[in-house]
Amino acid sequence: MIQVLLVTICLAAFPYQGSSIMLESGKVNDYEVVYPQRLAPLPEGAVQQKYEDTMQYEFKVNGETIVLHLEKNKGLFSKDYSETHYSPDGRKITTYPSVEDHCYYHGRIENYEDSTASISACNGLKGHFKIQGETYFIESLKLSDSEAHAVFKYENVEKEDETHKICGVTQNWKSYDPIKKPSWLNLTPKQQTWPQTSVNLQLIVDHSMYAKYNSNSEKITKTLQERVNIMKEIFKPLNLDITLSGIEMWDKKDLITVKTAATDTLKLFAKWRQTDLLKRIDNDNAQLQTAVDFDGETVGLAFKSTMCDKRYSAGIIQDHSAIPLLMAVTMAHELGHNLGMDHDDTSKCNCNVCIMAPRLNTNPSKTFSDCSNNDYQKFLTDKKPKCIHKKSLKTDTVSTSVSGNEPLDDNVDGFHA
């Protein structure tokens, strides 16, 4: 029987005092200190898992007590999830770690139908929750002998770069449409009729990003897994599941030339995926994660309507923010282009700030507009991408064997040179 933990988060005095604090998410000027405390122990004789399947937390936001329900995201990893790095002499070293007892959760706020939450419980609580249109972030203060956490809003995080972030989406070699630098969701009756689809996503970490995180492979892995956990929540209303097939780190050197010219880098990365990655790792789509600062305001680039195409089902992402939600939105935006979505036209779409807005907004959204919904359905109808129509969704059970070089669908119509 699934055991439920009940934890209360007791609010301390609001610590203004003109001071700020440096968190993993950046420098935060306005925050509340909270102390997660477990109220109900497990029943006698019960075996406690490292990370319970379900958890409940009670805490206050703006003086209002709310109850947060969390459920482990069991479909986060593919059955053959792998992690790859390289030896000094260039040999690939691939492992298949156990991922069943992971620490990533989705959730909702009790009695609030439109609420959502995406939380990592790997080392304290880290993530965000949304209630009544307001998004709050929570993060451990990592103080010695203390369970203190900070709760804050995005607007209270100092921004090093105030320029707008944009996206570049390409439909052919010569035409580029340049996101720019700045649930518990229930399906509607219409969405319930949409086919269940699933994208197996592979993430590649280039050498610049590896160096940016001080060569800490474990930290990079947790960071990317946290972002994909949020992506999975974002795509749920489309009846589309995101599974992480693996993470590869170019820890010794880059396997392509990662240029500041995003379009050149995207072409090189897509070619590498076709000629190298697909021969050894089964995936529907791959995204390159880099710390290289792309020219202009561009922080992401992807081919449009190319999901399942062996040549062009790819995107590139600049690691432009320490806030997981912003990075997950950027990754979801570029994947949206692969799935046939255009940038939102605010004069025609029913959403002022949605996932496919051409610029990242100061109030990050996890919602697709009606235009994006229509684009996606048109893509499914017109292109008929076979790879994402899987007979059964994969689970977190990990095999010990290599998936092999299974051929992908040839009957796709995407971006052609």
Swiss-Prot record:
Annotated binding of Zn(2+), by residue: 333, 337, 343
Active site: 334
First-tier enzyme category under EC: hydrolase
Cofactor binding: number and manner: Binds 1 zinc ion per subunit.
Propeptide residues according to the Swiss-Prot or TrEMBL record: 21-189, 393-417
Organism: Deinagkistrodon acutus
Record localization: Secreted
Disulfide linkage: 308-387, 349-371, 351-354
First and last residue of the signal peptide: 1-20
Primary role: This protein is an alkaline zinc metalloprotease from snake venom that possesses weak hemorrhagic activity.
A Pfam entry, by short name: Reprolysin
Name the record gives this protein: Snake venom metalloproteinase aculysin-1
Keywords (A to Z) from UniProt: Disulfide bond, Hemorrhagic toxin, Hemostasis impairing toxin, Hydrolase, Metal-binding, Metalloprotease, Protease, Secreted, Signal, Toxin, Zinc, Zymogen
Biological-process GO terms, alphabetical: proteolysis
Region (Disordered): 398-417
Domain of life where this protein originates: Eukaryota
Gene Ontology MF: a single term: calcium ion binding
Subunit structure: Monomer.
Biased composition annotated in UniProt, kind: Acidic residues: 407-417
Enzyme Commission identifier(s): 3.4.24.-
InterPro entries on file: MetalloPept_cat_dom_sf (IPR024079), Peptidase_M12B (IPR001590), Peptidase_M12B_N (IPR002870), Reprolysin_adamalysin (IPR034027)
Cofactors (names): Zn(2+)
Gene: wbfib
